[in-house]
Amino acid sequence: MPAIALDPIHQFEVTKWLDLRLGNIDISFTNASGFMLLGVVLVIGFFSMATRKGELVPSRLQSVAEMGYGFIADMVRSAAGEEGLKFFPFVFTLFFFILFANLIGMVPYAFTTTSHIIVTGALAMTVILMVIVVGLIKNGLGFFKLFAPSGAPLPIYIILTPIEIISFLARPLTLGLRLFANMLAGHIMLKLFAGFTVMLIGAGAIYIPVAALAFAMGVALNALEFLVAGLQAYVFAILTCVYLNDALHADAH
């Protein structure tokens, strides 16, 4: 068996599909670009097909789309309030892009774009930049009250304000790392169990019971990874709503 077949890291390698350069800048179209584009196309295609007819008695596909719409709307309303609903399109797009990217990664030989920190980090930075812009537009300099607990004595201000600033600056780091680490670790484990199963089967009949156990664990891990794919999209979206709520109501802190 080729060593590459058992290498759990090889699946994350970014490869060029189309070599493109703009002067000294490499703008090649890679497998990461392709699968991100595929995710966008699938999201648009799914909701376009589901809502094409807009029947009063919804079809199964339309029902799923409406459930997704209602789920995100309820999430935004509960975490960011009625005022946060103006950001529903952003949170909706973010959730389903991450969800479809995670699910695409579960297809054999597909590429998991969310297992790369450059992708999850870019998404996290987009969220935090939006939070800062919204906070400044909504509250002006009052946005900085977010870092100063109201009603606290001066010594507490001196201690807590730097902590609050560091905590805020760490948000994009933790937001991006959480998604990246979960997807990376999960796919490494899937690859290892699959590789062990094949290796044990090839080692002889005596190892068949152990291979069967490894296969069963791999199947269970696959089911868990589908759950993680949805859960991580939800966590990313709900934290986005929480951060937007902080920006919208900074003067309440």
Curated annotation (Swiss-Prot):
Superkingdom to which the source organism belongs: Bacteria
TM stretches of this protein: 27-47, 87-107, 117-137, 146-166, 196-216, 224-244
GO molecular function: proton-transporting ATP synthase activity, rotational mechanism
Keyword Phosphoprotein: no
Compartments in which it is found: Cell inner membrane
Alphabetical keyword list: ATP synthesis, Cell inner membrane, Cell membrane, CF(0), Hydrogen ion transport, Ion transport, Membrane, Transmembrane, Transmembrane helix, Transport
UniProt keyword annotation of Iron present: no
Cellular component terms per the entry's GO annotation: plasma membrane; proton-transporting ATP synthase complex
Xref: Pfam families: ATP-synt_A
Membrane topology: Multi-pass membrane protein
Cross-referenced CDD domains: ATP-synt_Fo_a_6 (cd00310)
Alphabetized NCBIfam families for the sequence: ATP_synt_6_or_A (TIGR01131), PRK05815.2-4 (NF004482)
Assembly, per entry: F-type ATPases have 2 components, CF(1) - the catalytic core - and CF(0) - the membrane proton channel. CF(1) has five subunits: alpha(3), beta(3), gamma(1), delta(1), epsilon(1). CF(0) has three main subunits: a(1), b(2) and c(9-12). The alpha and beta chains form an alternating ring which encloses part of the gamma chain. CF(1) is attached to CF(0) by a central stalk formed by the gamma and epsilon chains, while a peripheral stalk is formed by the delta and b chains.
Family statement drawn from the similarity comment of this UniProt entry: Belongs to the ATPase A chain family.
Function: Key component of the proton channel; it plays a direct role in the translocation of protons across the membrane.
UniProt xrefs under HAMAP family: ATP_synth_a_bact (MF_01393)
Name the record gives this protein: ATP synthase subunit a
Gene behind the chain: atpB
